[in-house]
Amino acid sequence: WFDPLRITETTTGSVTLK
């Protein structure tokens, strides 16, 4: 999952919402 208010790392190690 991703939080539009913060930078979160996925289980794959990818960074979303840079």
From Swiss-Prot:
GO biological process, alphabetically ordered: L-arginine biosynthetic process
Family indicated by similarity: Belongs to the argininosuccinate synthase family. Type 1 subfamily.
Keywords, alphabetical: Amino-acid biosynthesis, Arginine biosynthesis, ATP-binding, Chloroplast, Ligase, Nucleotide-binding, Plastid
Pathway stated in the Swiss-Prot or TrEMBL entry: Amino-acid biosynthesis; L-arginine biosynthesis; L-arginine from L-ornithine and carbamoyl phosphate: step 2/3
Organism of derivation: Pseudotsuga menziesii (Douglas-fir)
EC annotation from Swiss-Prot or TrEMBL: 6.3.4.5
GO cellular component terms, semicolon-separated: chloroplast
Record's subcellular location: Plastid, Chloroplast
Protein name, as recorded: Argininosuccinate synthase, chloroplastic
Assembly and binders: Homotetramer.
Residues making up the signal peptide according to the UniProt record: none
GO molecular function, one term: ATP binding
Main EC class the enzyme belongs to: ligase
Catalysed reactions, as listed in the record: L-citrulline + L-aspartate + ATP = 2-(N(omega)-L-arginino)succinate + AMP + diphosphate + H(+)
